[in-house]
Structures are given as C-alpha cells and as structure tokens.
Amino acid sequence: MTVTPKQIYNYTVLLEKELDGGYHAFCPMLKGCHSQGDTFEEAIQNITEAIELYIESLIAEHQPVPKEDLIVKPLSILV
C-alpha cells in the first residue's frame, strides 16, 4: 500500500457574526465551502474540516486544487 505524502494548503477564511448568535465561516477561493459554529473557535474548527473534505474530494476526482490568489484590502470610505 502506497502512502501519499500530505501537503499544506493555505487559504483565507472569512467569518461573519450571525444576528441570532454564532458565526458563519467561508473560504472565498473554494466556491461553496461554507460552515458555521456557535463560537468563533467552533466555526474555525468546522471550516477547517470543511476545507479538508473539499480538497480531499478534489484530489479524489483528479481535479486541480486552487491556489490562494485572494487579495484582502481594508478600505475606509468617507460618506
């Protein structure tokens, strides 16, 4: 049995506080990869697992794994 070496992937995730409590987490580079959690820590844990499963499914289907090319730039808008 051949063991495939693990690879590290780095992605930006965004977390939003929900109005009714908890957090919504998503990875913009991985379309449709979303999760949630009652706490910030739980949301981070859940989105990490969701990303792992997402990448594993891409690899299993011999699809390319997207590379992070997201640029995050905070803006100040004077209105």
Swiss-Prot record:
GO biological process assignments: regulation of DNA-templated transcription
SUPFAM superfamilies: TTHA1013/TTHA0281-like
One Pfam family cited in the UniProt record for this chain: HicB_lk_antitox
Family: Belongs to the UPF0150 family.
Protein name: UPF0150 protein ssr1765
Organism: Synechocystis sp. (strain ATCC 27184 / PCC 6803 / Kazusa)
Species classification: Bacteria, Bacillati, Cyanobacteriota, Cyanophyceae, Synechococcales
